[in-house]
Regions:
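Generic N-terminal amphipathic, Lys/Arg-enriched alpha-helix
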Residues: 14-31
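Glycine/small-residue-rich phosphate/adenosyl-binding loop
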Residues: 56-143
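C-terminal helix-cap and adjacent tail motif
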Residues: 2-7, 11, 186-248
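A glycine-rich helix N-cap at a beta->alpha junction
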Residues: 81-85, 95-97, 176-203
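Small-aliphatic-rich amphipathic alpha-helix that forms the alpha element of a beta-alpha
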Residues: 42-47, 105, 111, 121-178
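Glycine-rich phosphate/pyrophosphate-binding beta-alpha loops
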Residues: 47-54
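Short alpha-helical scaffolding segments that buttress acidic/His motifs in well-ordered protein cores
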Residues: 19, 42-46, 191
Length: 248
């Protein structure tokens, strides 16, 4: 099938408009009610995502009960305080927005699906390496579905929040009983969405030239350990939370 240049460009421009308007907020207008149809449209987009071996190793738990949202928020508030006591120096977000998010979807996966990917299952060192890669395949697959859901929410006019601080064992122990998730599954992230409590702003992005390499990696793009440590110490918080001049 030959793609017409004008039609292809129009589709690209429409897609880029959605991608650019997908902005993170952490405080929502709690008065908005997400219609069931919007949940289904968002998850329909996720359903069509690519996955390793077409295993589709994802499950989505739609949380609409106010009490459940509050309990999820309470766990993350405890995590916020825990990080403060540990003096991690990480600019932890304000998790109270979890309770006010009109839309909330918990993303889970079953790591037994790594068996669908190239593995030996003989306990060898080579098998360990293959299984390590298989876990990456699974995580990449679920991330692709989650991103599709985020873009669908943005297309519907919502702002979003990708909550990732959920991999540690304490989070699993808190979330699984609360949501009736079987032990065999793992909670990977939470998607919040809705109209923002206040106008969002676009985060700083690296320029196209900084991230693009043709045929070989450009050594000028490599960073030393010291440069990365310097960025974390001086630029991370600005990149996460502040407006910047280099926003496109």
């Amino acid at each position: 099938m030959q793609i017409q240049d004008d039609a292809g460009r129009a589709r690209y421009d429409a897609l880029m408009e959605v991608i650019r308007r997908r902005m993170t907020v952490r405080a929502f207008d709690p008065s908005h009610e997400v219609p069931r149809e919007h949940y289904e449209m968002i998850l329909e987009a996720a359903r069509h995502s690519p996955s390793g071996a077409n295993a589709q190793p994802w499950h989505f738990i739609v949380v609409t009960e106010t009490g459940l949202k509050r309990k999820i928020m309470e766990y993350f508030r405890e995590e916020q305080l825990r990080r403060a006591k540990l003096k991690m120096k990480f600019p932890t977000p304000d998790y109270r927005g979890l309770a006010s998010a009109p839309g909330l979807i918990v993303v889970a996966s079953d790591f037994r699906w790594v068996r669908a990917f190239p593995v030996l299952n003989d306990g060898s060192e080579l098998d360990r390496m293959y299984k390590q890669n298989a876990e990456r395949i699974l995580l990449q697959s679920v991330a692709a579905a989650t991103m599709a859901a985020h873009l669908a929410a943005a297309a519907l006019g919502y702002n979003v929040w990708w909550v990732t601080a959920i991999g540690q064992e304490a989070a699993q122990k808190a979330m699984k009983p609360l949501l009736g998730i079987p032990d065999e599954l793992s909670v990977l992230d939470i998607m919040c969405f809705g109209p923002p409590a206040k106008a969002p702003y676009k985060r700083w992005k690296k320029s196209l030239a900084e991230i693009t390499n043709w045929n070989r990696f450009d050594p000028a793009h490599a960073m030393t350990e010291a440069q990365i440590d310097e960025w974390v110490a001086t630029q991370r918080q600005k990149a996460m939370y502040k407006d910047a001049s280099n926003v496109d």
